[in-house]
């Protein structure tokens, strides 16, 4: 059973370090756009379904091309 705790500690450490290293300047909405990035950031409230209840969005084809 000690290996289970060692694995859990290692997993937690790696998961936390990945979150910290994943935040780069190019991905922040306040940073300038870089070549090759065409991203717009929008603010939404938690559990906001306004976009999905908007018929023009759902029929435009954008919603079906997310993957």
From Swiss-Prot:
Top-level taxon of origin: Eukaryota
Gene3D superfamilies named among the record's database cross-references: 2.60.120.1560
GO (cellular component) term, any one: endoplasmic reticulum
Entry's family note: Belongs to the flocculin family.
Additional remarks: Could be the product of a pseudogene. The ORF corresponds to a fragmentary flocculin piece with sequence similarity to FLO1.
Protein name: Uncharacterized protein YHR212W-A
